[in-house]
Amino acid sequence: MSPDLLGAVLVAAGYLAGSIPFGVVLGRLVLGVDVRTVGSGNIGATNVARAGGKKMGVLVLVLDAAKAIVPILLARRLLAGAPHAEAWSTAVAVAAFVGHLFPVWLGFKGGKGVATGLGIFAVLAPWAALAGLVGYAVAYGLTRISSVGSLTGTALCAAGGFATYGVRHPVPWAGLAIALLIFLRHRENIRRLVRGEEKKV
């Protein structure tokens, strides 16, 4: 199999991995509920934590991050030394993220992408991911509002990508696209923040 064909296969596999709705699966298997019908209706870690406690939320966060981390690491291993290996690995990362936002298994109605995005940055730009985690912790600690922490961390991850790679590498631009999609997914949260109606967690 040619490197480009293998890269395309890995991109498709990345999308399918990203589409796995761990929040929904664990909600049904462990909690006996469909998390899409409780709280905010989101399938991500924050809403799972509302439905089943912090431990369940952390588990979903880790799994949602892992479904991006594993495909990226696999792509890097299988494409090591091949032409455009870094570009293909970045494409796999984006595909996993798109899978989380638009999962084929849920009629293309997915989550907001924060944990999956964090997993991507953890592999492609670890220092940016660390900056994002610190930013999340500080912003959430000050406000007790999850969306404020998530958006702060996302912005720092995107900035950290450019600080790590500059502007001539595909990773920071992919990171910027991911950050913009996360902000777009949080548009209702942003509106509530502006109105002072966003709930604390």
UniProtKB/Swiss-Prot annotation:
Its EC number is 2.3.1.275. GO terms for cellular component: plasma membrane. It comes from the Bacteria. GO terms for molecular function: acyl-phosphate glycerol-3-phosphate acyltransferase activity. One of its GO terms (biological process) is phospholipid biosynthetic process. It is a multi-pass membrane protein. The chain crosses the membrane at residues 5-25, 55-75, 88-108, 118-138, 164-184. Its main location: membrane. The keyword Repressor does not apply. Catalyzes the transfer of an acyl group from acyl-phosphate (acyl-PO(4)) to glycerol-3-phosphate (G3P) to form lysophosphatidic acid (LPA). This enzyme utilizes acyl-phosphate as fatty acyl donor, but not acyl-CoA or acyl-ACP. This is Glycerol-3-phosphate acyltransferase. It comes from Anaeromyxobacter dehalogenans (strain 2CP-C). The lineage of its organism: Bacteria, Pseudomonadati, Myxococcota, Myxococcia, Myxococcales. The gene is plsY.
